[in-house]
C-alpha cells in the first residue's frame, strides 16, 4: 500500500465517518464528533468521485445534515468543517461554513457510497430548543475605548491607485506617503478604533478619522522612521522637515476638532456583545461552561479598553505598536497568553498571562509600555521581539489539573491524562502487577528508581508513594530516601491501627503525606478505631465515601474530622442512574476477588451503597469533601477527573439551586462563581496543598509553574484546546499535519514539541521527599526533570483546604445507610443524564 501518514490518518477519519453513517441510518441524531466525521469523510468521497469542484463541495457540505439529524447542541458547536483531498489538479482545501444550516439534510447524499439504507425523515424528532454550549450572556451598558485620551479629527485623502489600510495602533504620522493629511497634528497619535481593527482607504477616498494620543511613555518606533523617539513638541519642526523631505503627503487641516475621550464628541463606543466578538467577554458578562447549567461571571478585566493585545496581520502586536522595540530579551516575556478568562480558586477574571523561564511571572495587562498606559502595562509583562503569543480571546484558562490518586498500571495513562487537562500525577505502582492494580504503592527502592526514570521524559509532573503498611519503621526510611514523596496505607496490605500509627510516625519525621484506603472488612476495628489511630495527625483519606474502599458502611464519617483531608474518586461522581450497577464487577476485578467465594462477593457488595454515594454529592457541594481524583484503572477513569468534577457541580446546581455566598449565607450570587471556584479547587489547589507542592503548581498565580489549560467555553470540562506545560505547548488540538493550515480534519489532541525529546523533562517536576532530594536522587538516577521536595504537610487540617473546609458532624445509620450532617439527612436522586457527555464523545 505504501501509505503515508496523512493517508493513515484519513483512514481513521473515514472509519469515524462510516460509524456516524451507521448511526444516522438507524435514526440516531449525531453529536459533534459524529457530525464532523460524516461531513468530512463524505467530502473526501465526493472528491474521489471526481466530478465536483472545490466550490461545489463547499456548498454540498452544507446539505448533508440538518438540525433534525444532529443533537440540539451541535449547530452551536459546529461552525466550520475543513478537509483536504486529492483532486485531479492536486491537493486542495475544502471549507464548509455553517454546515448545519437547514432543518433537514439530504440523507441520500449523507449516505452516498455507504450502501446503508436511507432512513425516513420521520425517524428524526423535531428540532427543539436547547441552551447552547459556551453561551455568553452579555452585561448591559457600553464600553468607551481609549477613555480620557486626547482626541482630534483629521481629513485623510488617498492619492494612490491602490487601497491603503491602516491598523489601530500604527503611528499615524508614519502612514503611507500617498495618504494626504495634517501630519503635524497626527504627531503622537493613532486611530481611535477598536484594537486590532483598521481603516481602509480606497483609491481616491477622502475620509474624516478620529485619532487619539498614544499612551505610556509616548515613544514612537517603527513605521517609516520619520518620528522615531519620544514624542516631544520641541522636535516637531525637525519631524516635519523629514515628512516634506521624504515626500510624505501633508496638508494642514485647520478644521480639526479636538477634545478628550469621554466627553461624547470623539468617543468610540461598543456594546458588550461586539466587544466580546473581538476580545472575548469582559467584566459583568457571564459564560456557560460547556453544556452545563453553570455560568461564570467575569469579576474583573485587566484590559485597558482600546489597548488590548491582539496578534495577527494588521493587528496590535507589531513592531513599535503593541510589540515594543529596543528592549532586550531579559526585559521581555518569553510567552504571553492574551485576553484569557481565568477560572481559578482565586477568582474569575480576564487578563494577559506572562510566562518566563517556564513560570508565570505576571498576570495583568501586557504590551508595549512606550505606547500603552503605564497604569495598565505591567513592567513584568513587556511584549518584545523575543516574545511568543498564544491568543486566548474568547477562551478560558485554568491551572493544569492534579490527579492525586493514580495507579501507575500502564504508561499510556499519562497520554490520556494530559489530553484531558491533567498536568500532575501522584500515586504509586510499577505497571500491571497485581499489587499495583489494587494499590498505589511503589514498594522498593529499585521500583522507585524505575518509575522516576521511566516517567522522566513525560511532560507531566510526577510524584510516587511508597507502601506504608508495616507495624515497624524498618524499610520505610529506605523508600522515602529513594524518592517517595508520600506513603500509602491500603487495606489489601493490611490497614490496621498498628500499621497506621507506625506509618504516621515515620511520615511526621520526614514531613510527607500519608494516604489511606481503610479497612472495609472492619477486621481490626471500625471507623472510630481507625480515626483514633490517627491520633489527631494529618492524613489524606482516599475515596472517603467508601465505594472505592473503606470501613463499611460509615467511612464517610471521616469527612467531618478536622485532621482528615478527604477526597473522592471519580466513578461515584456524580450519583447517576447506572452508578451502582457498574461497581460490583469493577470492584471484583480491581481487588483480585473471586465471585465463586461468597465472602468475596459480600465484601464487594458491602462497599456499594446508593445512600452514601448520594450523600457524597451533597458533601462535595457543602465543601466537606475537598478533592476529586481518579483511582486510574483501579476503579477510576484518569481522563475524566475534570469532566466528572463539573458534572457533579452541575447536578448539585440542578438539585440544590445556587450556593449561598460564604461571606453572606443568606444571599446567592446571580452567577455560579462561588460553586465554580469551590469545584475547581478540588482538582487544582487542594491536592497541591495536601501533597506539599502548592508552592509550585495548583493555581494560576505568579511564581508557579506555567501549567495551564486552554478551553473553548463550549467544550469546557470535556475537551481542552491546548495544554501548556511549564510554559511549553505540550498537547493541543491539531489537524492534518500535511494540510495547508492547522485546522483541516482529522483534528485531534496531539503531542506537541513540549512533549518531545528532553522538553518533557525540562518543563516538568519530579516531586520527592526532602530526604530524597538531599540524598541526590536527581544525580543518582540521572533525571532530566527538575527535582523538588514536598513539605509543610504535617499539621495540615481541613481548614487549610481552599473553599472546601466544612466540618459537619456526620452520622450513618448502620442498617439503612442514611447519612446525616449536623442532623440533616443528606439525600438526593440519581440523575439519568449528565452534561459533558453525549454531545462530545464518539463512544
Swiss-Prot record:
Name of this chain's protein: Urease
Residues covered by the Urease domain: 400-843
Catalytic activity: urea + 2 H2O + H(+) = hydrogencarbonate + 2 NH4(+)
Broad class of enzyme this protein falls into: hydrolase
Keywords for this protein: Hydrolase, Metal-binding, Nickel
Post-translational modification: Carboxylation allows a single lysine to coordinate two nickel ions.
Catalytic residues as annotated in Swiss-Prot or TrEMBL: 591 (proton donor)
Function according to Swiss-Prot or TrEMBL: Urea hydrolase involved in nitrogen recycling from ureide, purine, and arginine catabolism.
Record-level GO BP terms: urea catabolic process
EC number from the UniProt entry: 3.5.1.5
Cofactor entry: Ni(2+)
Record-linked NCBIfam families: PRK13192.1, PRK13203.1, PRK13207.1, urease_alph, urease_beta, urease_gam
Binding site for Ni(2+) 1: 405, 407, 488, 631
UniProt pathway annotation: Nitrogen metabolism; urea degradation; CO(2) and NH(3) from urea (urease route): step 1/1
Positions annotated to bind substrate: 490
InterPro entries: Amidohydro-rel, Metal-dep_hydrolase_composite, Metal_Hydrolase, Urease, Urease_alpha_N_dom, Urease_alpha_subunit, Urease_AS, Urease_asu
Amino acid at each position: 500500500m505504501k501509505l503515508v501518514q496523512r493517508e493513515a490518518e484519513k483512514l481513521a477519519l473515514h472509519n469515524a465517518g462510516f460509524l456516524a453513517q451507521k448511526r444516522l441510518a438507524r435514526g440516531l441524531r449525531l453529536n459533534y464528533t459524529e457530525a464532523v466525521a460524516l461531513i468530512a469523510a463524505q467530502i473526501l468521497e465526493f472528491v474521489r468521485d471526481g466530478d465536483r469542484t472545490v466550490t461545489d463541495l463547499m456548498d454540498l457540505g452544507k446539505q448533508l445534515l440538518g438540525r433534525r439529524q444532529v443533537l440540539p447542541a451541535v449547530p452551536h458547536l459546529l461552525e466550520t468543517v475543513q478537509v483536504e483531498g486529492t483532486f485531479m489538479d492536486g491537493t486542495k482545501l475544502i471549507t464548509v461554513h455553517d454546515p448545519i444550516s437547514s432543518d433537514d439534510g439530504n440523507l441520500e447524499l449523507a449516505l452516498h457510497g455507504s450502501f446503508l439504507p436511507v432512513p425516513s425523515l420521520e425517524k428524526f424528532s423535531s428540532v427543539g430548543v436547547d441552551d447552547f454550549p459556551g453561551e455568553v450572556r452579555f452585561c448591559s451598558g457600553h464600553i468607551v475605548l481609549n477613555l480620557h485620551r486626547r482626541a482630534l479629527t483629521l481629513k485623510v485623502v488617498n492619492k494612490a491607485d491602490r487601497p491603503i489600510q491602516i491598523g489601530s495602533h500604527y503611528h499615524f504620522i508614519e502612514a503611507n506617503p500617498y495618504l494626504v493629511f495634517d501630519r503635524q497634528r497626527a504627531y503622537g497619535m493613532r486611530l481611535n478604533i477598536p484594537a486590532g481593527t483598521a481603516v481602509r482607504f480606497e483609491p481616491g477616498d477622502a475620509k474624516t478619522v478620529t485619532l487619539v494620543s498614544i499612551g505610556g511613555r509616548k515613544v514612537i518606533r517603527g513605521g517609516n522612521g520619520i518620528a522615531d523617539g519620544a514624542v516631544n513638541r520641541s522636535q516637531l519642526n525637525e519631524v516635519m522637515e523629514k515628512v516634506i523631505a521624504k515626500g510624505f503627503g501633508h496638508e494642514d487641516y485647520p478644521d480639526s476638532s479636538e477634545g478628550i475621550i469621554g466627553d461624547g464628541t470623539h468617543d468610540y463606543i461598543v456594546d458588550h456583545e461586539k466587544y466580546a466578538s473581538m476580545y472575548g467577554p469582559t467584566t459583568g458578562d457571564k459564560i456557560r461552561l460547556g453544556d452545563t447549567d453553570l455560568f461564570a461571571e467575569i469579576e474583573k478585566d485587566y484590559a485597558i479598553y482600546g489597548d488590548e493585545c491582539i496578534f495577527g496581520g494588521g493587528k496590535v502586536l507589531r513592531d513599535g505598536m503593541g510589540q515594543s522595540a529596543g528592549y532586550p530579551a531579559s526585559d521581555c516575556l518569553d510567552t504571553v497568553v492574551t485576553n484569557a478568562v481565568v477560572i481559578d480558586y482565586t477568582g474569575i477574571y480576564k487578563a494577559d498571562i506572562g510566562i518566563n523561564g517556564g513560570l508565570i511571572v505576571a498576570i495583568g495587562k501586557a504590551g508595549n509600555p512606550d505606547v500603552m498606559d503605564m497604569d495598565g502595562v505591567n513592567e513584568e509583562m513587556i511584549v518584545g521581539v523575543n516574545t511568543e503569543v498564544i491568543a486566548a480571546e474568547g477562551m478560558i484558562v485554568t491551572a493544569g489539573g492534579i490527579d492525586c490518586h493514580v495507579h501507575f498500571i500502564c504508561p499510556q495513562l499519562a497520554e490520556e491524562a494530559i489530553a484531558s487537562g491533567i498536568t500532575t500525577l501522584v500515586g504509586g505502582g510499577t505497571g500491571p502487577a497485581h499489587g499495583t492494580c489494587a494499590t498505589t504503592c511503589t514498594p522498593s527502592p529499585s521500583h522507585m528508581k524505575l518509575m522516576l526514570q521511566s516517567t522522566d521524559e513525560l511532560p507531566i509532573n510526577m510524584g510516587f508513594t511508597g507502601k506504608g503498611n508495616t507495624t515497624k519503621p524498618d524499610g520505610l526510611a529506605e523508600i522515602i530516601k529513594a524518592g517517595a514523596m508520600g506513603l500509602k496505607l491500603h487495606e489489601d496490605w493490611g490497614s490496621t491501627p498498628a500499621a497506621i500509627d507506625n506509618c504516621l510516625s515515620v511520615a511526621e519525621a520526614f514531613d510527607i503525606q500519608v494516604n489511606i484506603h481503610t479497612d472495609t472488612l472492619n477486621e481490626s476495628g471500625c471507623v472510630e478505631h481507625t480515626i483514633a489511630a490517627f491520633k489527631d495527625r494529618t492524613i489524606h483519606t482516599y475515596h472517603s465515601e467508601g465505594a472505592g474502599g473503606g470501613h463499611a458502611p460509615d467511612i464517610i464519617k471521616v469527612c467531618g474530622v478536622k485532621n482528615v483531608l478527604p477526597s473522592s474518586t471519580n466513578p461515584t461522581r456524580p450519583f447517576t442512574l447506572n452508578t451502582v450497577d457498574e461497581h460490583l464487577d469493577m470492584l471484583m476485578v480491581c481487588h483480585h476477588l473471586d465471585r465463586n467465594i461468597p465472602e468475596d462477593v459480600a465484601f464487594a457488595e458491602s462497599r456499594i451503597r446508593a445512600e452514601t454515594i448520594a450523600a457524597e454529592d451533597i458533601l462535595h457541594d457543602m465543601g466537606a469533601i475537598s478533592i476529586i481524583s481518579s483511582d486510574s484503572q483501579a476503579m477510576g477513569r484518569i481522563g475524566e477527573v475534570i469532566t466528572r468534577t463539573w458534572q457533579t457541580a452541575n447536578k448539585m446546581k440542578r438539585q440544590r439551586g445556587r450556593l449561598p455566598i460564604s461571606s453572606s449565607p443568606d444571599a446567592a450570587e446571580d452567577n455560579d462563581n462561588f460553586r465554580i471556584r469551590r469545584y475547581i479547587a478540588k482538582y487544582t489547589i487542594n491536592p497541591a496543598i495536601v501533597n506539599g507542592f502548592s508552592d509550585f503548581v495548583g493555581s494560576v498565580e505568579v511564581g508557579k509553574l506555567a501549567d495551564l489549560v486552554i478551553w473553548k467555553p463550549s467544550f469546557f470540562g470535556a475537551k481542552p484546546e491546548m495544554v501548556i506545560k511549564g510554559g511549553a505547548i505540550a498537547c493541543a488540538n491539531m489537524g492534518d499535519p500535511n494540510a495547508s493550515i492547522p485546522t483541516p480534519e482529522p483534528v485531534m489532541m496531539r503531542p506537541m514539541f513540549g512533549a518531545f525529546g528532553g522538553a518533557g523533562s525540562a518543563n516538568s517536576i519530579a516531586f520527592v521527599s526532602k530526604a530524597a532530594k538531599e540524598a541526590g536522587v536527581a544525580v543518582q538516577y540521572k533525571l532530566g526533570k527538575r527535582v523538588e521536595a514536598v513539605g509543610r504537610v504535617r499539621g495540615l487540617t481541613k481548614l487549610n483546604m481552599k473553599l472546601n473546609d466544612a466540618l459537619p458532624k456526620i452520622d450513618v445509620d448502620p442498617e439503612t445507610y442514611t447519612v446525616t450532617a449536623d442532623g440533616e439527612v443528606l439525600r438526593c436522586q440519581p440523575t439519568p443524564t449528565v452534561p459533558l457527555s453525549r454531545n462530545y464523545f464518539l463512544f
